[in-house]
Amino acid sequence: MSRKHYKPLLLGLLTAAVAGVVSAQSTTPPDKDAAFRQGIPAAASKHQAGLPGGIVTLHTPGADRSGYTRTPIKHVILLIGENRTFDHVFATYTPPRGQTINNLLSEGIVNADGTPGPNVAKARQWQASQTGTYTNAPTHTSPFATLPSMNTGGAPTQAPFSSAAQAQSIEPALPSDAYEQLAEGGTGLPNKVIDTRFPTKLANAPVDMHASLSYNDYANSPVHRFFQMWQQLDCSMQSATATNPSGCRADLFPWVETTLGAGNNGAKQPANFTDQSTGEGSTAMQFLNVAKGDAPYFAELAKTYTLSDNFHQSVMGGTGANHIMLGYGNPIFYADANGNPIAPPINQIENPNSQPGTNNWWIQDGYGGGSYVNCADDTQPGVAALKGYLGSLPYRTFRGTDCKPGAYYLVNNYNPGYMGDGTPAPLGSTQFTIPPTKQDNIALLLSKHNVSWKYYGEGWGGGKENGEAGTFCNICDPFLYSTQIMTNPTLRANNQDINDLYTDIQNGTLPAVSIAKPDGILDGHPASSKLELFEGYVKKIVDMAKANPKVWNDTVIMVAMDEGGGYYDSGYVQPIDFFGDGTRIPLLVISKYSQGGRVVHTYYDHVSFDKFVEANWGLDATISPRSRDNLPNPIALRRNPYVPVNAPAIGNLMDMFDFSRGPWSAAAVQDGQQN
């Protein structure tokens, strides 16, 4: 079962004060793949120098090179929240004087008070028709006269904790004055009913949440899956312009929500199907209003440090695939014990063609259904449409979209191939777990070059994945998928918990590269969390780093989302390959070299973090020949800084810093170029 699927249930149990909740992989059902599993390496009991579980030589052991950098940055900490697009958070943000920004307010789509602006038609949403073979650009029928009503979905009726004291007894990662937030904000309504906190009639426009809810309230989560997001963005070269050369119209968000939602796992369409049957309504059109005080801490960070308004999720869709792309620079595929591609169970293969007699109700898709796609085979469902569109672009996509032959890539959320203790996870048609992978990743590249790294996953529990009442996000840890890491005790030990991060910050013992993930309570995921909780998680870490002058002097903290969560966003999307990019997401860069409230327009996605690491530590290497860190830095025109003219291209985040003093001003560390 996927984290995205079980998380609302998890919070319901927390509401009832059940502290013994377990993670998605805690139980061990009968292993139907015993024969297959015999060939998969288990965790080694002894570490041999340089040998991950005795499988592959990583490097010749040598001196730690973590301190050898091309900039004054010696430590980077990436904090990853969940499921918010750039416009969803910063729709009405006004930057400091002298800075420009691309958001709903600057585009005239909304006014600062959240009402529709003079250019609201730019965000008009349409109804469409797909009654047969999948297309990423379905035929438009008519615009919505009014948007479908909001739905409560899986948002909790009551807050997950009965008191701040109860929350603090389980959850360690908030400032002491923030625990009341976990005992407040329930909807007061049942799940999957019309959300009466919002107006009954909604204009065909982005919806200001502040007008109906407190920033402290829980709200629903929209669909955020692979083929659905391709449809929501509705990309066609017939709509391409000079400022939007990919032709992505972003005008089918509520239609996809209300016709299919998060998938059906192969089930037939329910009888008496309506625009509320998927439990979403028009959730995707909601936005927070910083001009009215929403997201106050992130707005403060943006005005103090550096904000990107052109950072994107790397993969269309959800959490698992985007964390994997961050770690590997490439999606991972279903593999045998030798790491070679093989076909997954048939019920786990995506089929986004419509069931007969339905409009966009698919044959096979869901967290307990289809999530793999063989994109090298144009006869596979959904593949020809996407490759046809990609082939029509005015530039050649990355590697010509040459998916590995016979490889079924994971494009949504499945459990990783290893438990936290290095035990292989059960496989089978009902397990929804991807086998371990031997594909290369950024951690292996760092280890090869003797650069230190850690992944701090809150709730890790020493590998038991049971901390914080079992709210550890297993699908978020890219390295739980890796044979080379999980079978090597030394490398596996780099998976740590939130208190280990606190200790390393306070003691000045941070590794060079840190990735940190909150648990499912604080990650900001709609329905199961709130953005203010992720703000609190970030604030505790930032304050701790600033309190240690040694750490603050040479550390950068980057704050990003894993993906946009299916929310509407008005920004440009650059198709790179079959898998994405997807919508914009926020990126804040916090350091003494990133001050002044700048807004950077250079084109980035998650793999830009990998490029930053490679550039800063002078690795002069990429993760693999297929990884996106091989892409060039973008070149853009001054009149349109958001669109790389050398597409596909992604930056290395160096533009997020001001290294203008001392030896760090060398052009070698710069990022994008403007002509």
Identify the meaning behind each predicted range:
Residues 2-23:
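Gram-negative bacterial Sec-dependent N-terminal signal peptides
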Residues 25-675:
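N-terminal pro-sequences and low-complexity stem/linker regions of secreted or lumenal proteins
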